[in-house]
Amino acid sequence: MIASKFGIGQQVRHSLHGYLGVVIDIDPEYSLAPPEPDEVANNKTLRSSPWYHVVIEDDDGQPVHTYLAEAQLTYEDVDAHPEQPSLDELAASIRHQLQAPHLRN
């Protein structure tokens, strides 16, 4: 079993670029089309580690889906981000949905 560092609904930062994101899904290993030779995913060690579907915001505040290796992410210690409140809301909404009981009728 592969353990992941980050969880769904958790806020993270890109370790190189510093942008804030929210984890929306996790793959136990790289699962997209075979990478090009110049892509980060071409590294076999990175491909066999967890990969994360992360929502970030572009310069216009629009959501952008990214796919990042665990090695590219760091923990985010701050809970509130006044400059990007929609990412705070997304993270809170996902965490709430994961904690809410599922009702079956």
Curated annotation (Swiss-Prot):
Q: Is Cell division tagged as a keyword?
A: no
**GO biological process per UniProt:** response to heat
Q: Does the keyword Oxidoreductase apply?
A: no
Region (Disordered) spans which residues? 80-105
Gene3D superfamilies (alphabetical): Hemimethylated DNA-binding domain
The terms describing its cellular component in GO are: cytoplasm
A single MF term (Gene Ontology): DNA binding
**Sorted alphabetically, which keywords does the UniProt record give?**
Cytoplasm, Stress response
Protein location: Cytoplasm
Q: In which broad location class does this protein mainly occur, judging by the first location in its UniProt entry?
A: cytoplasm
User: What biological function has been recorded for the protein in this entry?
Assistant: Involved in the degradation of certain denaturated proteins, including DnaA, during heat shock stress.
HAMAP family hit by this protein: HspQ
Q: Which family does it belong to?
A: Belongs to the HspQ family.
Q: What is this protein called?
A: Heat shock protein HspQ
Q: What is the lineage of its organism?
A: Bacteria, Pseudomonadati, Pseudomonadota, Gammaproteobacteria, Enterobacterales
